[in-house]
Each structure stands twice: as structure tokens, then as C-alpha cells.
UniProtKB/Swiss-Prot annotation:
Protein name, entry field: tRNA-specific 2-thiouridylase MnmA
Family in the record: Belongs to the MnmA/TRMU family.
Cystine pairings recorded for this chain: 137-235
GO biological process, alphabetically ordered: tRNA wobble position uridine thiolation
């Protein structure tokens, strides 16, 4: 087992704000909820959040093992500012683990990440969807494969630097997933697919902190990454140009087609449906009187359908690959019961009220969400994350949007 915090020599305790540090350590202990000395794997990406997570757990007296996944290593993505899990970030994680005084392992998951995240990302665009690879990464590589590694290492829990909270309601025997204390950093949207079994094993020590506090803790500990920029956008997409990745992974996938007005008029040509997303206005290169937006993508017909902004208004959507953390057994069961929910269709938006219904069909039917009002620019492929209207901080689950019902179509 790891030594207690008094034995972690690399930390410069003389320069530490003990009030801040004591609060942070106690918060980490509370988030873990396991006896001091328990082995915990800390997922370390090389960023500020995961590094502080590992450091706080070590100071709290846990037996911490740092694990970093090498997920990709191609071209400009390696040196992209704000990337993670490649190149310099792996070196940063290794150096941080050495300073903290914990063992550190780097695991090569490049081929698995390529297959489960990058290729799925490209294929989703070819299907006319707008994918959300961060959810796929958490759902597969990080919260499935890495949890298996943690168990193989003899850990009782795995901690990450995500900004979400895990807590128990009175009398409950299973934890809830809840939004972070800092709304600006809340990552619950990206973790909706976390299963109840995974949540039993996971810990999120930073969920009750804000980012300025985390950076202060990093600075007090003398960690070199205290001022390192946050990761931005999609980690494996160089300079935000996602079409570069698609063209490399599926070089002959995107074929030209027609830009079609929703009234049936052909307005021009496009270079491939992968260049467009629902709600897009720029880059259409068509000259008409009123502003037009992408309202639908028909990949089978190679058509990008455009219309006025009001055509983006959505009254309902269908979900696939659902995950459910509520009292019902599944998302389908909650939908069959007509459960009221708060629904969030983009990470940058607040949840809005709606109600689940179930469309009869194979495999238990298809969950459907009907909004109380109208929601703009809902895109197939994105996540729809569901929260409890009686307790809006609680994540109930969600699914991936497979189809939408437009008010204007």
C-alpha cells in the first residue's frame, strides 16, 4: 500500500496553503468513500484535472497507481495545443506521477481507439449524423477497457478528473451520477452512458470543486502542469478540421450530391455530406434571398436539405443505445411508463422539459422523447441526456439521437 501523505517527499509542503490543501484532501477522501490505504487507479491524461486527482488521492493516503492510455499518435494531432493522450501529454503524465511518487503505466490503446472511436466518428458523418466522440471514448475505451485494467491491478476503485459528482441518496444502495458543483465545467452530458456497474467502481474527486481551485491546488503542489491549457474540441482532430480525419480514414467515402431546398428545388451541388451538420448556415455557397440552414442530411440520396431557420424546430426525437440510472430497469421501461424528464441535446444548452414515450417494436421498442416546447437544431448522432425534473442535478441517463420529428417538416 502507498505511504501516507507525510511520506510523499516530492511535495513542497513549506509552500503549501494548508487550509486549501486540507479542504481539497478531505473532499477527495469524501468522494472516494473508502478506507485510507485502499488501492485506487488514477486515470492520468497529462492534464491538470487528472494530475490533481492523482496527487490529492496520494496525499489523502491512498495506494495510487497512475495509468495513461496512448490513444493516437498521428501527424499534427500529436502537437495540437489542448490535445490529450498522445505525445507531450504522456510525458507530462509520467513526470507528474514521478513527482507525486506513484507508479505509472502507459498502455497502448491506439488500435482500439481507432476502431471504436475514430472509425465510428468517420462512419457516423458518412451516415449523415453529427457524432459525439467524447461520449464514445468514455463509454468504451475509458470506462470499459480501463476499468478492466484497474481491476487487474487490484484496485478497489478508479478515479478520473471529470467534473461530475457521485453520491448516495438517503437509504439507497447504489450511487447517483450528478452534475458538477461548477456549472461551467460540468461534464455530465459526456458521461450519460456510464452504467450503474461502472458508477459503483468510479470516483470523481474534483466534482465538488471549480477549475480555479483545482489550478490553485496544482500550483500549491508545485506541479508543472498547473497552467497547462484545458483540452479543447475533439482531441484527435488537428486544428478542428474534422473532415481531414474523415478523408484519411474513409478516403472514398464522401461523394458529391445536390443541395436541395425543402420545397424540392435543387439549389446547387456539394462535395460530400460529411461537410455539413444540422443547423449549419456558413459554407453553403448558394445565393438566395433569405438565410438558409441545413435542416436534414439524406446520406443515401447524397442530399443536403436546406430551409429557413424555423424548419430546425424539433418537437420529438427517437433514441438508441439507451442507458438508464433511474429507478426503472431500463430506458425502455421508463419510456413505457411515460416518465417526465429534463432533456439536454447539446452540452452547451440547459435541459428542457419533456416526456418519454415508447414506440412498440422489436427488442422492447424504441424510446421516444416529446419536448414540452420546441427545441432548435437537434441532430441525429448527438446525445440526448436526461435529468430528473424532481432533482435537476441528477443524471437519469440518455441515449443517442437516431431520428427527429421537425415541427416544420
Amino acid at each position: 500500500m502507498a505511504a501516507m501523505d507525510a511520506d510523499i517527499a516530492p511535495f513542497d509542503t513549506a509552500r503549501t496553503d494548508h487550509g486549501l490543501m486540507d479542504r481539497a484532501v478531505e473532499q477527495a477522501r469524501a468522494a472516494v468513500g473508502l478506507p485510507v490505504g485502499t488501492r485506487i487507479v488514477a486515470a492520468m491524461s497529462g492534464g491538470v484535472d487528472s494530475t490533481v486527482t492523482a496527487a490529492l488521492l496520494a496525499k489523502a493516503g491512498y495506494d495510487v497507481v497512475g495509468v495513461t492510455l496512448q490513444l493516437y499518435d498521428h501527424g499534427a494531432a500529436i502537437t495540437k495545443k489542448g490535445a490529450c493522450c498522445a505525445g507531450q501529454d504522456i510525458l507530462d503524465a509520467r513526470m507528474a506521477a514521478e513527482r507525486i511518487g506513484i507508479p505509472h503505466y502507459v498502455l497502448d490503446y491506439e488500435s482500439r481507439f481507432k476502431e471504436q472511436v475514430i472509425e465510428e466518428f468517420a462512419d457516423a458523418y458518412l451516415r449523415g449524423e453529427t457524432p459525439i466522440p467524447c461520449v464514445r471514448c468514455n463509454q468504451t475505451v475509458k470506462f470499459r477497457d480501463l476499468l478492466d485494467v484497474a481491476r487487474d491491478l487490484g484496485a478497489e476503485a478508479m478515479a478520473t478528473g471529470h467534473y461530475v459528482q457521485r453520491s448516495f441518496a438517503a437509504g439507497a444502495n447504489r450511487p447517483q451520477l450528478r452534475r458538477a458543483a461548477d456549472p461551467a465545467k460540468d461534464q455530465s452530458y459526456f458521461l450519460f452512458a456510464t452504467t450503474a456497474e461502472q458508477l459503483d467502481f468510479l470516483r470523481f474527486p474534483l466534482g465538488g470543486m471549480d477549475k480555479p481551485t483545482v489550478r490553485l491546488v496544482a500550483a500549491e503542489l508545485g506541479l508543472a502542469i498547473a497552467d497547462k491549457p484545458d483540452s479543447q474540441d475533439i482531441c484527435f482532430v488537428p486544428e478542428g478540421k474534422y473532415t481531414t480525419v474523415i478523408d484519411r480514414i474513409r478516403p472514398h467515402g464522401a461523394l458529391p450530391g445536390d443541395l436541395v431546398h425543402m420545397d424540392g428545388r435543387v439549389l446547387g451541388r456539394h462535395e460530400g455530406v460529411t461537410r455539413y451538420t444540422i443547423g449549419q448556415r456558413r459554407g453553403l455557397n448558394i445565393a438566395v434571398g433569405d438565410p438558409l440552414f441545413v435542416v436534414k442530411i439524406d446520406a443515401d440520396k447524397r442530399q443536403v436539405i436546406v430551409g429557413p431557420r424555423e424548419a430546425l424546430l424539433t418537437q420529438a426525437l427517437s433514441l438508441k443505445e439507451g442507458n438508464w440510472l433511474g429507478v426503472e430497469d431500463s430506458l425502455e421501461a421508463a419510456a413505457a411508463a411515460g416518465a417526465p424528464v429534463l432533456a439536454r441535446v447539446r452540452s452547451t444548452r440547459e435541459p428542457v422539459p419533456g416526456r418519454l414515450t415508447l414506440v412498440p417494436g422489436p427488442n422492447g421498442g424504441e424510446p421516444r422523447l416529446v419536448f414540452d416546447g420546441l427545441e432548435e437544431g437537434v441532430a441525429p448522432g448527438q446525445a440526448c441526456v436526461l435529468y430528473d425534473p424532481a432533482d435537476p442535478e441528477r443524471v437519469l441517463g440518455g441515449g443517442f439521437i437516431v431520428a427527429t420529428e421537425r415541427a416544420g417538416l
